[in-house]
Curated annotation (Swiss-Prot):
Keywords: Cell cycle, Cell division, Cell shape, Cell wall biogenesis/degradation, Cytoplasm, Peptidoglycan synthesis, Pyruvate, Transferase. Gene3D superfamilies: Enolpyruvate transferase domain (3.65.10.10). InterPro entries: Enolpyruvate_Tfrase_dom (IPR001986), Enolpyruvate_Tfrase_sf (IPR036968), MurA_subfamily (IPR050068), RNA3'P_cycl/enolpyr_Trfase_a/b (IPR013792), UDP_GlcNAc_COvinyl_MurA (IPR005750). It comes from Escherichia coli (strain K12). PANTHER family: UDP-N-ACETYLGLUCOSAMINE 1-CARBOXYVINYLTRANSFERASE. Cell wall formation. Adds enolpyruvyl to UDP-N-acetylglucosamine. Target for the antibiotic fosfomycin. The gene is murA. Belongs to the EPSP synthase family. MurA subfamily. This is UDP-N-acetylglucosamine 1-carboxyvinyltransferase. It comes from the Bacteria. One of its GO terms (cellular component) is cytosol. One of its GO terms (biological process) is UDP-N-acetylgalactosamine biosynthetic process. The modification 2-(S-cysteinyl)pyruvic acid O-phosphothioketal is found at C115. It is found in: Cytoplasm. Phosphoenolpyruvate binds at K22, N23.
Amino acid sequence: MDKFRVQGPTKLQGEVTISGAKNAALPILFAALLAEEPVEIQNVPKLKDVDTSMKLLSQLGAKVERNGSVHIDARDVNVFCAPYDLVKTMRASIWALGPLVARFGQGQVSLPGGCTIGARPVDLHISGLEQLGATIKLEEGYVKASVDGRLKGAHIVMDKVSVGATVTIMCAATLAEGTTIIENAAREPEIVDTANFLITLGAKISGQGTDRIVIEGVERLGGGVYRVLPDRIETGTFLVAAAISRGKIICRNAQPDTLDAVLAKLRDAGADIEVGEDWISLDMHGKRPKAVNVRTAPHPAFPTDMQAQFTLLNLVAEGTGFITETVFENRFMHVPELSRMGAHAEIESNTVICHGVEKLSGAQVMATDLRASASLVLAGCIAEGTTVVDRIYHIDRGYERIEDKLRALGANIERVKGE
């Protein structure tokens, strides 16, 4: 397995170009299964999960090509099963189910894999599809969905806010007969992006970005060209990198209005932040950040995917800060690893109490999930001495060329190929 070797401390400064959002690209790739004409998707990040999704679409019979943009022609899809060998590494595969059953009347997906953070069950996806008229069976490790004729529009009240299930229901409802209303829908920018992609293909959707999405079913979806929005979590990660190293950064190809909660906390930490239409700059003026209190919650509140990075910020900040995680259980696996580097933290149920220290020291640490591993790499950039981050395949699932981008900001980082 590959590792990163990071030599610190360095001040990170310069410019970084933000990639397309993984969490929008993946649902959009699967939503392309609904289209009866070719689609072109631009600004798709080069990531392991994206490659796996493209491979899966090919196995279903779609023609998939990448030359800058990703081109998908799903006219000849003739396989309706997403097999275990592809699904086991990536939970996003469940998003194939809604489009398959909506367009072809049948679909089956092996139960998914992915990061190990907490319970992320597929029950909300299943109950949503059942309410649209699909028959669901769980057999031999597969979720099997079928319907005679078309799905039927329904009024669906989500038990809890779920980005994944909102995507599944919204995609399936585009080809259902009649109107579907999703109440307590997720409001994330990536949901809005997926909806806008579907609208480009001819879907009738309104209310995306609010907690009530209305979908009027249409008979078919055509083709089109669509550009994936910038990755707000990658943007936030690089802003934190500059903040903890007392540096200065400009993030290009960003979308500031998707990051309001994160930018507010960075300002509280003492960062000087400016935004333009598609850029964000942060300048610490050489100062150490101040500790901040953070509580994660569904959008538009503070995103859980930025929690590990802000835990790190607090651990090197002036003062004591509290980080409370309300979205996923079991999402503090980075804290013991940061403690190995000299961080002072206590975990009390779903809160980390962070006591800022002047400096961290390099150590051998292990990545446990995608965002936690990014925080360990950033910690290595500012720690004194050498840090080796093991199991970085987690990072490759969500960050495009993170070592190249950090190196361009002045980091001393190299990838060590595993045996």
